[in-house]
C-alpha cells in the first residue's frame, strides 16, 4: 500500500512539473513564427481598422488573449 502511494505521488509530481514547464501560454510564438497568432491578430485588426492593434496583438500575450476572446464572442 505504501509503495503504490509513493509511486502515485512521484507520478503526480512529474506530471505537475512537465505541465508547468511545457504548457506555458506565454511560450506561444510571435506573429513572425506562429500562423495561428498571425491569423488571429489579422482578424482582430480587420475588426478594429487600427494597425496599432495588430502590432500590440503580435507583441503582447495579453493583447493576443483579449483579441481571441473578443473574436470568439462575435462568432
From Swiss-Prot:
Instruction: Please state where this protein is localized.
Output: Secreted
Membrane spanning stretches: none
Mind telling me which GO cellular component terms the entry cites? Answer: extracellular region
Write out the similarity annotation.
Belongs to the scoloptoxin-03 family.
Q: Where is the signal peptide?
A: 1-23
Which keywords appear in this protein's UniProt record, sorted alphabetically?
A: Disulfide bond, Ion channel impairing toxin, Neurotoxin, Potassium channel impairing toxin, Secreted, Signal, Toxin, Voltage-gated potassium channel impairing toxin
Q: What is the lineage of its organism?
A: Eukaryota, Metazoa, Ecdysozoa, Arthropoda, Myriapoda
What organism, scientifically named, is this protein from? Scolopendra mutilans
Q: What does this protein do?
A: Inhibits voltage-gated potassium channels.
- The main location is secreted
Q: How is it modified after translation?
A: Contains 3 disulfide bonds.
Q: Which GO terms describe its molecular function?
A: potassium channel regulator activity; toxin activity
What is the tissue localization of expression for this protein?
Expressed by the venom gland.
Name recorded for this polypeptide:
Kappa-scoloptoxin(03)-Ssm1d
Amino acid at each position: 500500500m505504501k509503495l503504490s502511494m509513493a509511486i502515485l505521488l512521484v507520478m503526480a509530481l512529474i506530471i505537475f512539473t512537465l505541465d508547468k514547464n511545457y504548457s506555458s501560454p506565454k511560450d506561444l510564438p510571435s506573429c513572425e513564427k506562429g500562423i495561428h497568432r498571425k491569423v488571429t491578430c489579422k482578424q482582430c485588426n480587420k475588426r478594429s481598422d487600427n494597425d496599432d492593434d495588430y502590432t500590440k496583438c503580435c507583441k503582447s500575450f495579453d493583447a493576443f488573449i483579449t483579441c481571441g476572446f473578443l473574436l470568439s464572442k462575435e462568432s
